[in-house]
């Protein structure tokens, strides 16, 4: 029997062998605090590729040193960082998966000794420091940093770029009226709050012609914040700019209580897919093959982003295949393992 979860998916000239994506998750493991890839990253991402994930997405990678969440985040702000990232993509490709990178700036959530930058001088909560409102010059420099990061991503061998526009980091801070109190052309109306992201997408499109994703937080979980309907308009603009897929997460732009349950964010992927007519990825407490397959067969999303479940078990695709009774291709080195479900050599 054929399963959609294990069917190929093509975006532009990149074909994923299945619909399983390793969701980007910060590992805080650049031990020398220089943004460099370490041996841990090679093993961490290479193992998920060997486990038959279709697309392995590298964690949020800072486009500027001051855009890191912590000093131990990965970086892509300098050419010296390309070599380590290229080793990582080579590991991933050698094990049969495609490689993606999430480009990010932490904004007011940067927990560094230096000043945190944000659209407005509004702290995330009472315990975090008040950020510095970005000048227009700093905005332009950050847009350029995303463009240069895209160039380096191409040089490092990535197949897909994702822009991190979610979870209360810098781009999300510009999009939400809860964190953006500006009165210039970057604040106020939805069009103005979108301007920063628009400029980033345009700048990346000048140097990158591969698949482009954007991760969003489709619900601020606040009465004065954004809802998924607001993001329908944002994602329509993204589609007009050539974005290929929306990775639909939620929350974290302000402190909020969120009731989580299995697949609690799938509704956002479905809503954006239906109302913005753009491909989406579903993420959030998706833990079984049957659950993932149902999301795809119900046409609620196009890709399945798996996070913590892949931390618990890097061979989740094999477990999902066994659960569904599907014969998944496996590395020939593992064929002697008990419970193998393929005889490919």
From Swiss-Prot:
Signal peptide: none annotated. It is an enzyme of class 1 (oxidoreductase). One of its GO terms (molecular function) is FMN binding. The keyword Repeat does not apply. It catalyses: A + NADPH + H(+) = AH2 + NADP(+). InterPro entries: Aldolase_TIM (IPR013785), NADPH_DH_bac (IPR023663), OxRdtase_FMN_N (IPR001155), YqjM-like (IPR044152). FMN binds at residues 23-26, 60, 102, 215, 307-308. Its cofactor is FMN. Belongs to the NADH:flavin oxidoreductase/NADH oxidase family. NamA subfamily. Catalyzes the reduction of the double bond of an array of alpha,beta-unsaturated aldehydes and ketones. It also reduces the nitro group of nitroester and nitroaromatic compounds. It could have a role in detoxification processes. Homotetramer. This is NADPH dehydrogenase. It comes from Bacillus cereus (strain AH820).
């Amino acid at each position: 029997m054929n399963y959609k979860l294990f069917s190929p998916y093509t975006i532009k000239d990149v074909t994923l062998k299945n619909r399983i994506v390793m969701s980007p998750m910060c590992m805080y493991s650049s031990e020398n605090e220089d943004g460099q890839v370490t041996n841990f990253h090679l093993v961490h991402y290479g193992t998920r590729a060997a486990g038959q994930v279709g697309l392995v997405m590298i964690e949020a990678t800072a486009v500027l040193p001051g855009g890191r969440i912590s000093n131990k985040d990965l970086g892509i702000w300098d050419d010296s960082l390309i070599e380590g990232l290229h080793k990582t993509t080579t590991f991933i490709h050698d094990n049969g998966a495609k490689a993606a990178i999430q480009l990010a700036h932490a904004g007011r959530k940067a927990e560094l000794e230096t000043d945190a930058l944000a659209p407005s001088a509004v702290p995330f909560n009472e315990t975090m420091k008040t950020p510095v409102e970005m000048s227009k010059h700093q905005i332009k420099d950050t847009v350029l940093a995303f463009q240069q990061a895209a160039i380096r991503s191409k040089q490092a061998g990535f197949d897909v770029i994702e822009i991190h526009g979610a979870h209360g980091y810098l781009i999300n801070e510009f999009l939400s009226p809860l964190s953006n109190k500006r009165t210039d052309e970057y604040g106020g109306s939805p069009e103005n709050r979108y301007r920063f992201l628009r400029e980033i997408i345009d700048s990346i499109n000048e140097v990158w012609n591969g698949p482009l994703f954007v991760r969003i937080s489709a619900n601020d979980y606040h009465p004065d914040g954004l809802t998924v309907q607001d993001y329908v308009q944002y994602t329509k603009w993204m589609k007009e700019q050539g974005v290929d897929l929306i990775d639909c997460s939620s929350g974290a732009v302000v402190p909020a209580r969120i009731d989580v349950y299995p697949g609690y964010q799938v509704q956002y992927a479905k809503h954006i897919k239906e109302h913005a007519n753009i491909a989406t990825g579903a993420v959030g407490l998706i833990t079984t093959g049957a659950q993932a397959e149902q999301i795809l067969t119900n046409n609620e999303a196009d890709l399945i982003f798996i996070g913590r479940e892949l931390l618990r078990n890097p061979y989740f695709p094999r477990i999902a295949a066994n659960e569904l009774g599907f014969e998944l291709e496996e590395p020939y080195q593992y064929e002697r393992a008990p419970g193998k479900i393929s005889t490919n050599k």
